[in-house]
Amino acid sequence: MKLYCVGHSVSSPCLVLQFKQTNIMLDCGLDMSTVNQFTPLSLVNNEKFSQLKSWSSRELQEIEGFTAQNNLKEAGGRLFIDAEPEVCPPETGLIDFSMVDVILISNYHHMLALPFITEYSGFNGKIYATEPTIQIGRDLMLELVTFAERVPKRRNGNMWKNDNVIRCLPAPLNELANVKSWRVLYSKHDVKACISKIQAVSYSEKLDLCGILQLSAHSSGFCLGSSNWMLESEYEKISYLSPSSSFTTHPLPLNQTVLKNSDVLIITGVTEAPIDNPDAMLGEFCTHLASTLRAGGNVLVPCYPSGVLYDLFECLYTYLDNAKLGMVPIYFISPVADSSLAYSNIYGEWLCQSKQTKVYLPEPPFPHAELLKEARLKVFSNLHNGFSSSFKTPCVVFTGHPSLRYGDAVHFMEIWGKSGNNTVIFTEPDFPYLEALAPYQPLAMKTCYCPIDPRLNFAQANKLLKELQPRHLVMPESYSRPPVIHPHRTDLTIEDPGCSLTTFNHLDVAALPISRSFEKVVIANELSSCLHPQHVRPGVAVATLTGTLVTKDNKYTLQPLEFLVEPKAGSEGGDSSTNKGQLSRHLWGTVQLDDFVRSLKKRGITDVNVESSGGEHTIHLPNDDAMILLDRGSTHIITHGNEELRIRIRDALLECVPQF
């Protein structure tokens, strides 16, 4: 078993697990930390950003073509790239994504790179996710694409990606890595095509993968529809512990029972804010919000259009009334705002028990339905469709994007940033708030960092791992050492789990200590009826048997031996025959590739393409839509149900293998 780490950061995981001739992708996270290096996409021709001076140096001017393609701008004492922000999808050079059999998505935050794979990599396998994950993930993608497309950015070349240019830049730009793999966002068409390929699953639903593994999703408690995935064969159990939560919020609680006693447990998604308690941060959020409103200022909350947002609305529903601020308007601005709020109210079976009860009464499970009914919460898709006519201050505005590089949050930063009465409150932990604010400096408005991250912290994760008792633990290497900003906090690590441990980093290929010890074999009825068990001691009976082991669709069947049938002397047909004895053939040695190709051509299979790598051979038969995989220990024939073709290939193979 091997694990390939093709994701670029711990917070945006993308892993490929190779097990029993299958390739399983676990999550498809998109690294968006790269957008911090770009100037914001402003809705209007902003004076500050439009008048930024280009930056250069003597070394850069000597590089041919740089001056004509100089995208570097200086703002707030540091450099930014003045172009459409680019993101970093999973690494494509480590493994061929067209060979991936299935993609398992754990939550809607970890599927944002999916269009890059489904539309541009040759992938044609299956994708599984829960219904809320599919719909809310679609909303997140469409919001991002809308933000990017409505503010077209003039492209002035990619000279800034040149290695010689990067070496001449000041920090942090000179520390950038993998810039050649950065890409602009996909299109709305890509999103729709991608979403159409995802198959919805329910919790605990059993999915068959090539007859080898049973896949099932189980609640992780992190967000609506979030899942931990279980991969089970007859004798192995592999668990993927994705971002999970033990806090009692709106999703179904974490189902940890199914994760116990795994042969391999892969853990990702421990909190990005390890020293910040979500309940305490929620209290700080409300306190800062109320103090700003009482002073006549406005509050901007850069956020995603789902997730913690629902909990913030629920908190403000009662808090503003108790603070005698019930008449302060709350605005939720997003291209997918209506869709997000609507879905939150109809996914009753994915909610915690208390909210499920409300759905069946029937009552709205979330209080934001009451806020909408009372016109205290007002929803807009953008700033120019009726927003200005209902806009009143002081107010609270929830809008995207948390990075402050896309969306309507950029506009509010521009118009409110000059006043010290206003406050921007960061609740999403995915983007360092100082990085997000950097291009807006100097800034008069107050800033508050209240990261509300319900994911497991290290103490909770360590407690959970002791209860789950896996035989082998796999985790990012960064979990084994304290965070960079808290180097002395040794408690902010995954402790010795009491089992074997494998850690990984970006682009690592980890060999996991699990091998195929047993396989289930079914004995054919014809063979089992011939068995004559002999009792050797009470409760134990044994019998010898001889048969032919048949492998098809990764299922093993023991069939009766074939008989060598010859016509009787003097007979013209094969109707009358005598049993000359059982056919006994023992194969040994290796297949000679040239002999095998000749044997195929002798049987009419002439269109043969061979690819060889490290002792392994892949033989493509384009005309027959088939493929043969040969390696040192096994042979696989893939004919998509063409039994006649499979038999011809088998006979050609047997002709080339020594036997006695």
Curated annotation (Swiss-Prot):
It is found in: Nucleus; Cytoplasm. Keywords: Cytoplasm, Nucleus. Its main location: nucleus. The keyword tRNA-binding does not apply. GO terms for biological process: RNA polymerase II transcription initiation surveillance; snRNA 3'-end processing. PANTHER family: INTEGRATOR COMPLEX SUBUNIT 9. Component of the integrator complex, a multiprotein complex that terminates RNA polymerase II (Pol II) transcription in the promoter-proximal region of genes. Component of the Integrator complex. The core complex associates with protein phosphatase 2A subunits, to form the Integrator-PP2A (INTAC) complex. This is Integrator complex subunit 9 homolog.
